[in-house]
Curated annotation (Swiss-Prot):
ATP binds at residues 24, 181-182, 223-229. It catalyses: L-glutamate + ATP = L-glutamyl 5-phosphate + ADP. The keyword Transport does not apply. It comes from the Bacteria. GO terms for molecular function: ATP binding; glutamate 5-kinase activity; RNA binding. It comes from Xylella fastidiosa (strain 9a5c). Substrate binds at residues 64, 149, 161. SMART domains: PUA (SM00359). It is found in: Cytoplasm. This is Glutamate 5-kinase. Belongs to the glutamate 5-kinase family. Catalyzes the transfer of a phosphate group to glutamate to form L-glutamate 5-phosphate.
Amino acid sequence: MTGTPPPSRFPEQPIPPWRRAVLKVGSSLLAAAGGGLSPRFALDLAHFVSANITAGRQLVIVSSGAVAAGRALIPPLPESGGALAARQALAALGQAQLIALWQRFFDRPVAQVLLTHDDLRNRRRYLNARATLRELLHLGTLPVVNENDTVSVDELKLGDNDNLAAIVAALIDAQALFIATDIDGLYTTDPRHHPDAQPLHEVRTLTPEHLAMAGDSSSTVGTGGMRTKLEAALKAGAAGIDTYLFNGRSSDVVRGLAQHRLRGTRIHPTCTPIAARKYWLRHAPVEPGAILIDAGAAAALAQQGASLLPGGVLSAEGDFRRGDMIQIATRSPDHPPHPLARGLVQYSAADVRRIAGCHSRDIQPLLGYTYGDTIVHRDDLVLL
């Protein structure tokens, strides 16, 4: 569905407050007619990002466009992009151009983050990616994420950056996913062929019927259509994240977003972010082994919602690795270990044994490296 009916067909609606969000920008909004990249639509989107950062919010951009940028630097390839190796070469050539496009709009550092889905499926790499993005946001930089198309074979597929944007939104505990498209939002049918197509300004629950409405259309420069955007909304919704589809080619629409007004489609999540994360933490498979903690640490976790620090750790059982889901248990002289919580551990069992009972500032001297002050962060922990 790629028609562009008047924006007024989508009624204006308020956007609930959010603290952290992901903005996904597709190739069709960045590609220049004669090849390469154009700042035409990116400028309005940059104003949206800048206004929210100035207001104290945090944003990550997931941006396509590297392959489109690369095409302008070498002789033309067939419309399909040629062999996989050629597309990967185009991505390598164009990635620097893509980051340069975004950097020109901001007076703060823009950080390039290249990810594959393997980075986010592997628990240890997942933790590393999340820690990096959080630190970049903490430092006040603007992370710009893209698929690592140069080395990823399976990742060069339809709509991958749409899905990546949803995964990144969950990764950083975002409250909103904004997907900039070249159409106004979701319709009951393809408005290019059906003038009576009705706009859907709000979707409470995505259904197979909605996916069927979207079809599988895509632009000539990108690799995704409306269907993949709805699939991304499903992923985001399962993590408790609102998704907003809007026309990134409309200056009025983008300016409205900066004032928390949407003319487009809002897709509601299926649960709250906290409920989604806690459900996953509670039900994800647990690796063999456990961390045994003292009464003080147990009270801090149970009564104060604190993170697990090394000072309250007595010992570690088993051979778990960084990123594993492990059990946290209390131990006292008169009672056997009692399960208290479970969570994603930042250090391996061997490391936990070495730093058990020490102050967080001693982690670096003892191990020679550090993954942070906590053994299990409170965001990665759920009480039993």
